[in-house]
């Protein structure tokens, strides 16, 4: 049995002058049936609420202010789920709406609850349709794009594959719209991904979406580090999903690492919000990165922010480059007290245990 997550972007769902959003969903849904009939499981992460809301309200360009974005998302989400329900019901498929914000994944308990709910739904042969809850999320609590959200959903359910449907055929060495010599990249191994991502070789943001290729590369990095294969495919070609379901290599394939970091450390790395920052000396940075050590108070040079036990912090080196994230074993007040030599014989106290520390 396979469990796949498919992320459907706004650029796909908006359709064209010849194809409506409903027709796009119909084309997609028909390709799902043979995959599901073999006992496989599917979760969709969908964008499109803001775009549909703007269509409904006759707003010609994507709003810039948060309140209008949230209002159009509220209107559009109703239309979006209505279309999914109408189309999938014709095929005898049941769906469920799941709306998520960053806060829902911020604690380990809520992350696990979301995971259990999603897994139970697919056990019941229901297709969960996930979207960010744009109506209530403020800027601080927004993922801002569903590419990142789709990777976290894939990790939460231990998916075998994440498929990113977009409006380009595959990843390119340069932006193909502006560079005739751009070369397609068919395969990306994890050792290559960070360099490609950091170069930000394309930035194909469109008017209606919030992602672009850069967020898809971030999504691929998150998922592959957690052991999930990622495939980036042109979703405007309705034959492509059939090709994917037949295990054909089209688009760009991102291979997972051989030794995934595990569900818990994936959550620490990518889902949790940090509330403080700890700067390490060079010795502590080396011990954490190369020896898998816990962070001890003796290796701490500076503390920023206020935090209590079990809250998440960003851990950086002397150049302010992120080394890791982790859950602290002591409060910021206690740690500052140690650094200020107000307490003696506490330099060996554990600040972040290696079991709750994830390398960046």
Curated annotation (Swiss-Prot):
Annotated compartments: Cytoplasm
A GO cellular-component term linked to this record: cytosol
A UniProt-annotated Pfam family: PUA
Keywords: Amino-acid biosynthesis, ATP-binding, Cytoplasm, Kinase, Nucleotide-binding, Proline biosynthesis, Transferase
Binding positions for ATP per the UniProt entry: 7, 166-167, 210-216
GO biological process terms, semicolon-separated: L-proline biosynthetic process
Pathway: Amino-acid biosynthesis; L-proline biosynthesis; L-glutamate 5-semialdehyde from L-glutamate: step 1/2
Recorded catalytic activity of this chain's protein: L-glutamate + ATP = L-glutamyl 5-phosphate + ADP
One function term, GO molecular function aspect: glutamate 5-kinase activity
Principal location class: cytoplasm
Binding site for substrate: 47, 134, 146
InterPro entries: AceGlu_kinase-like_sf (IPR036393), Asp/Glu/Uridylate_kinase (IPR001048), G5K_ProB (IPR041739), Glu/AcGlu_kinase (IPR001057), Glu_5kinase (IPR011529), Glu_5kinase/COase_Synthase (IPR005715), Glutamate_5-kinase_CS (IPR019797), PUA (IPR002478)
Residue stretches making up the PUA domain: 275-356
E.C. number: 2.7.2.11
Protein family membership: Belongs to the glutamate 5-kinase family.
Known function: Catalyzes the transfer of a phosphate group to glutamate to form L-glutamate 5-phosphate.
Name assigned to this protein: Glutamate 5-kinase
Organism ancestry: Bacteria, Bacillati, Cyanobacteriota, Cyanophyceae, Synechococcales
